[in-house]
Amino acid sequence: MPVSTTLLQSDLPGLPLRHRGKVRDVFDIPRDRLPADAPPGDYLLMVATDRLSAFDVVLPDPIPGKGEMLCQVSNFWFHKTEHLMPNHLVDIRVEQVLPEGVDPALYAKRAVVTRKLKPVPVEAIARGYVIGSGWKDYQRTGKISGIELPDGLRQAEKLPEPIFTPSTKAAVGDHDENIDFDAMVKTVGAELAERVRDATLRIYRFAADFAAERGILLADTKFEFGTDADGRLYIMDEMLTPDSSRYWPADQYEPGTSPPSYDKQFVRDYLETLDWGKTAPGPRLPADVIDRTRAKYAEALQRLAGISVD
């Protein structure tokens, strides 16, 4: 899979920009840009750029091809798990909705057409290991998101059972905050909260088993869900990518340590060496950090989905 031109920001005349996130640009698709046989409803074009964020700050340097790799990992998992949960993808090709004069090759592997859904205003996180913010919470309270855990767990230790730990959905530049299930119920209602929790854990278990067969541990992951006009629940946005998940090589896993991961850890480690306040604007990245980070994303894509990057 040759990497296409690096894309830091997408601008598509004729498609109204709905949202520009840390990585994805989302556009409304006017009805006159849809194929004549498109089912009734509203649709979005979601573009995965090559932007990179760390510590909730979008950095000035992109990772070449990252958006394509993220999009392909997501699409792989959306199709792999559609027997477990419907997703936001629809059968409309990207080139059918792009404005005139836009090179389809630039967007073919980094964009998807999706249903327009009402987002559930909570991040749905599944954890199988005690690491990251969960490890910090556990050290302080013996709990993660209000869930009591056994005493004496070490950093990165596998939990007795996967747990559901929701968080707030922060705006770009702000920080998500872990909340307990009762707080989620107050936000979205008991019935929807239970559906999201059950779907999150069901998908996590399936994906963790699948990844383990390929020598990868899925430590934790974050999902986003949305509902349609009839209240049907869909998984949306991205799915089980190195940006939304913590993947570890099984042969390098050791409880009591912070295992290496298939993500932007090289970037975070480099930034921690700088005198930087973790606020915008972010610092520039050295070429070797960019190259090593890209290689980690490419390795994850190949090992999980069997797709090689040239």
Curated annotation (Swiss-Prot):
It catalyses: 5-amino-1-(5-phospho-D-ribosyl)imidazole-4-carboxylate + L-aspartate + ATP = (2S)-2-[5-amino-1-(5-phospho-beta-D-ribosyl)imidazole-4-carboxamido]succinate + ADP + phosphate + 2 H(+). It comes from the Bacteria. Pathway: Purine metabolism; IMP biosynthesis via de novo pathway; 5-amino-1-(5-phospho-D-ribosyl)imidazole-4-carboxamide from 5-amino-1-(5-phospho-D-ribosyl)imidazole-4-carboxylate: step 1/2. GO terms for biological process: 'de novo' IMP biosynthetic process. The keyword DNA damage does not apply. It is an enzyme of class 6 (ligase). Keywords: ATP-binding, Ligase, Nucleotide-binding, Purine biosynthesis. GO terms for molecular function: ATP binding; phosphoribosylaminoimidazolesuccinocarboxamide synthase activity. InterPro entries: SAICAR_synt/ADE2_N (IPR028923), SAICAR_synth (IPR001636), SAICAR_synthetase_CS (IPR018236). GO terms for cellular component: cytoplasm. Its EC number is 6.3.2.6. The keyword Repeat does not apply. PANTHER family: PHOSPHORIBOSYLAMINOIMIDAZOLE-SUCCINOCARBOXAMIDE SYNTHASE. Belongs to the SAICAR synthetase family. This is Phosphoribosylaminoimidazole-succinocarboxamide synthase. It comes from Xanthomonas axonopodis pv. citri (strain 306). The gene is purC.
